[in-house]
Every structure is written in C-alpha cells, then in structure tokens.
C-alpha cells in the first residue's frame, strides 16, 4: 500500500520515469551560483589574512561568524555615493601597502608625524583597525539583540549616541543643511538620521549646540594647525595639497569615494555584515581615531616640554594608558594577533660554521674561491717576476741554530 501523502511518480506509456529537465537545469544553475559565492568568499578571506599582516586583526577578535563558507554581507556594500572604478584597478596587482600610505597621510594631516615614518604608520594603523573591529563587534551584538544578522543604521545610532560630542560631529558631518522638503537620499542611514532630526527634539538641540562643542573641536584643530605651520609651511600654502585633508581609506584620491577601495577596506576589517553604504561611517570613524591619536600624542609631548616631531616612543608612551578614543568601550590593545592561514614551513640551509683564521672567510663560498684564485695568481706573478729579473742569483737556504747541539745533530 502506498501512503496517501506520497505523490505518484510520472511515467510514460512504456513505464519510463519522466524527469523535468527545467527543474534539473535550475538546480544546476543554483549550484553553480553557490560555488561562485563560496569561491569569492574564500578569495576575500585570503585577502583578509593577507591584509592582517599589517593590520594585526585576527579571526579571534571578530564576533560575527566567518567560517561558514560564505559572507554574511547581504546588502550591496556601496551605492550611488561611490565611483564605479572596479575596472581601473586589479586585485592581484593592488598592493596592501596602500593602507599604510593612506594612514601615513592621515597621520601627517593630524600633525603627528612625517609622511615617511613607517614604524609610526604601522602602529597607528594597527590601533585604528583594532578599534574599528571593536565598534563593529558592539554594533553586531546590538543587531543580534534585535533579531538581525546585519548591522544597520539603528546600531550605528546606538554606538555614536554614547558620546554626545561625536554624535554632534556626526550630525554636522552628514546633515550639513537639514531640509524637511528633501526627498532624495543616497542611502538608508541618511534618510534615518534626517527623519530623526525632525522627529526628535533632543537630536535637534544636540545638532545646534555649537557653543558647547565648538571650543573642544577648535582646540584640537588649532593645535594641529600650529604643528603644520611650524613644520609644514609649504604644505599649508600650496593648493596642490588640498586633497590631502579629504583623503581616507575609501577616498584615497581626496575627490570621490572609490568602490574598489571600499571593498578592500571592508575585507581588511573582516567583512562585517553592513547595511548599504555604512562603510562611509566606519571610514569617518577611522579618521576621527587617527586625529584623536595624533592630538593626544602632541598633548603628551607638550606636557613634558618636548620639541620637534613625535617619534615612535612618544606614540607608545602616550597611548600606554589610553583606551577607546571615541565611545569608551572596553578594548584590549595588548592581545597578540593570530594568523588564519598558516604558511608552509620554509627550510633554508646555511653553510657550516668556519672558524676565523688569518684570512677572514667571506659569508659565501663563491667569494672565498674567487679570493683563493686571486691569491694563487698573485703568487705566480711574484715567482715569474723573480725568475725573469734574478736568473743568475738562485735563492739560498740559510739555517739558523739557536744551540750548538742542534748543529751537531
């Protein structure tokens, strides 16, 4: 007996099973798409590990799941605000040192270092990336609390509202001219904060409380400008360097947001699941972190009467007791990074140790044999010189005895 809930199979007149080829083709296409997604995810994960050699971010510091074969990013990472430049750059030829170059420019704009100080740049970049990952972890846990698996505008609001000064700066940055008649927005988070401004009176009061927050902002800006006027007067007067002040990780040129660099910055952060164009907010927070680090380093040196530009030790000592620069989160800056993909062990052979003699052996055997050939050639030249110029005076061996007994022997 066949149960009633089981559908009978379709067969033809000869009893052969009828198979719907359209369903098979659709399943094959879905399988191919899934394979492509997993392949792209593996490539992104390898690039994340490649960038982590500079950023110091490990998979143990990330709270959103990564080891599941595909990314959690569902919404488009970029939108109308970005310049479509994916075809201009090639991923396999794009150097990861670009992150350090941008960090060096931002540190230079903060007045805290020269453009060519690699150690300071690496220190600032690693501290900035670790702070951003901690912010993403905070927002991801908020999203999970609200039964969501993607960070959206509400989570950003909960993070930035922890600090009224930063929330004031955020509103002034992304809502420069609030207009109730505005209807077009490039992304959802601008639309959300635009409505919040007109619906929440507290938000409007915070937005217009310039007298309270401007002195704090101007204090940092004045100190950085003084540093530039003392050590970089040509940069301040040259209009060719105006784009430096607008440079960021997703805007390396200083003129427009780059979609290609936004994806690379997202991969370096560990691919957090973000709502569309929220990468702009993380990029803005990165600039704030670097500016805050630079200002605190300058203040630390001013308090001790140090002159000149800060060195690496000044950065390390100034940040020794500092925590989260923006939102007072509990961030551990001492955790050592771990690698996601272990590189194969490379065995390298070295020549055996040779004791030092009268003739110092070089580090490589090729140089040693060349030196021996030169010495032998020099000996042959000396012998031929003696034979040609002193043929009638052969050399005579003279024995010298120190005791008479040796002579008899």
UniProtKB/Swiss-Prot annotation:
Biological processes, Gene Ontology terms: cell differentiation; male somatic sex determination; masculinization of hermaphroditic germ-line; positive regulation of gene expression; positive regulation of meiotic cell cycle process involved in oocyte maturation; positive regulation of oocyte development; protein localization to chromatin; regulation of germ cell proliferation
Molecular functions (GO terms): protein phosphatase binding
Record's protein name: Sex-determination protein fem-3
Keyword Isomerase included in the entry's annotation: no
Subunit structure: Component of a complex containing fem-1, fem-2 and fem-3. Interacts with fem-1 and fem-2 (via N-terminus). Part of a E3 ubiquitin-protein ligase complex, at least composed of cul-2, elc-1, tra-1, fem-1, fem-2 and fem-3; mediates the ubiquitination and subsequent proteasomal degradation of tra-1. Interacts with sel-10. Interacts with tra-2.
Known role: Required for male development. In XO (male) animals, fem-3 directs male differentiation in all tissues. In XX (hermaphrodite animals), it specifies the first 80 or so germ cells to be sperm. Negatively regulates male development when bound to tra-2.
The keyword Amino-acid biosynthesis is assigned to this record: no
Keywords: Developmental protein, Differentiation, Sexual differentiation, Spermatogenesis
Cystine pairs: none
GO CC term (a single one): protein serine/threonine phosphatase complex
